[in-house]
């Protein structure tokens, strides 16, 4: 319970600290994919804070599993799959 009572103060301090961060412009490099993955300081800090808060405690709500964004995620189409039968099943309704 002591941890929960200190949470508003910690969040207030973190929000003030994040408010003072300045966004840095993303410089153009030679590789456009690397440029897309760069982020400014405020964005990275906000994402890390959100990630920490979501996974920090069970008392604050559900702990969400990490998002799977790899090549084998749900919804990706298998290249070797036969598209004739499975892709037309919705038309039979």
Curated annotation (Swiss-Prot):
Keyword Signal included in the entry's annotation: yes
Residues annotated with Tyrosine amide modification: 74
Coiled coil segments of this chain: none
A Pfam family it matches: Calc_CGRP_IAPP
Record GO cellular component, one term: neuronal cell body
Pro-sequence residue ranges: 24-35, 78-93
Tissue-specific expression: Abundant in the islets of Langerhans but is not present in the brain or seven other tissues examined.
Keywords in alphabetical order: Amidation, Amyloid, Cleavage on pair of basic residues, Disulfide bond, Hormone, Secreted, Signal
Signal peptide: 1-23
An example molecular function term from Gene Ontology annotations: receptor ligand activity
Gene Ontology biological process terms in this record: amylin receptor 1 signaling pathway; amylin receptor 2 signaling pathway; amylin receptor 3 signaling pathway; amylin receptor signaling pathway; bone resorption; eating behavior; glucose metabolic process; negative regulation of bone resorption
Keyword Secreted: yes
Positions of disulphide bridges: 39-44
Cross-referenced SMART domains: CALCITONIN (SM00113)
Cellular localization per UniProt: Secreted
Oligomer and partners: Can form homodimers. Interacts with IDE and INS. Interaction with INS inhibits homodimerization and fibril formation.
Role according to the record: Amylin/IAPP is a glucoregulatory peptide hormone that plays an important role in the regulation of energy homeostasis. Selectively inhibits insulin-stimulated glucose utilization and glycogen deposition in muscle, while not affecting adipocyte glucose metabolism. IAPP function is mediated by the CALCR-RAMPs (AMYRs) receptor complexes. Amylin can also bind CALCR receptor in the absence of RAMPs, although it is more selective for AMYRs.
Domain notes: The mature protein is largely unstructured in the absence of a cognate ligand, but contrary to the human protein, it does not easily form fibrillar aggregates.
UniProt record similarity statement: Belongs to the calcitonin family.
Protein known as: Islet amyloid polypeptide
Gene field: Iapp
